[in-house]
Amino acid sequence: MAKQSMIARDVKRAKLADKFYAKREELKKIISDANSSDEDRWAAVLKLQTLPRDSSPSRQRNRCRQTGRPHGVLRKFGLSRIKVREAAMRGEIPGLKKASW
């Protein structure tokens, strides 16, 4: 089980990313637009730098919904490989079965 502080930190980052998503996209659009002037671009870069660091989506970490484990998380299920295996062995995931060849 992951530390509760680490899970809470990721939840906080997700909330910040949602809050500043529109503003970040607007500034990024100005920066990448070839028609905008150099002054406008530079102003947008400076504004983007003033936003909270944790509002960037790339700072979020995929975590297991049950345990908070940060590694080996399968996106399709939102669970770590260990919990997916346990659920599959109990038959809780429809259509998923252990491979054999």
Swiss-Prot record:
PROSITE patterns named in the record: RIBOSOMAL_S14 (PS00527)
GO cellular-component term (any): small ribosomal subunit
GO terms under biological process: translation
UniProt keyword terms in alphabetical order: Ribonucleoprotein, Ribosomal protein, RNA-binding, rRNA-binding
GO MF annotation list: rRNA binding; structural constituent of ribosome
Pfam families named in the record: Ribosomal_S14
Stated family: Belongs to the universal ribosomal protein uS14 family.
Function, as annotated: Binds 16S rRNA, required for the assembly of 30S particles and may also be responsible for determining the conformation of the 16S rRNA at the A site.
Quaternary structure, from the entry: Part of the 30S ribosomal subunit. Contacts proteins S3 and S10.
Record protein name field: Small ribosomal subunit protein uS14
